[in-house]
Amino acid sequence: MSDTAERIKKIVVEHLGVEPDKVVENASFLDDLGADSLDIIELVMAFEEEFGVEIPDDSVEKIGTVKDAVSYIDEHKA
């Protein structure tokens, strides 16, 4: 798992209170990890702070899985 993926996993575990082994690449934040819309907003804010990236609202809709988040951040981080 990449450094980005490990850091995202840590954030997801902390914010959603899920077991680390549930946070796998293809896990859906909504369906598999039990996040609701408020959780998604909080996760995005945490990702932005952790990685120094801005994630616009139209991009948030495209980040549905852990893998989506890793890909987006890897493409946009400084």
UniProtKB/Swiss-Prot annotation:
Keywords: Cytoplasm, Fatty acid biosynthesis, Fatty acid metabolism, Lipid biosynthesis, Lipid metabolism, Phosphopantetheine, Phosphoprotein. Pfam families: PP-binding. One of its GO terms (biological process) is lipid A biosynthetic process. It is found in: Cytoplasm. Residues 2-77 form the Carrier domain. Pathway: Lipid metabolism; fatty acid biosynthesis. SUPFAM superfamilies: ACP-like. 4'-phosphopantetheine is transferred from CoA to a specific serine of apo-ACP by AcpS. This modification is essential for activity because fatty acids are bound in thioester linkage to the sulfhydryl of the prosthetic group. One of its GO terms (molecular function) is acyl binding. One of its GO terms (cellular component) is membrane. Belongs to the acyl carrier protein (ACP) family. Carrier of the growing fatty acid chain in fatty acid biosynthesis. This is Acyl carrier protein. It comes from Zymomonas mobilis subsp. mobilis (strain ATCC 31821 / ZM4 / CP4). The gene is acpP.
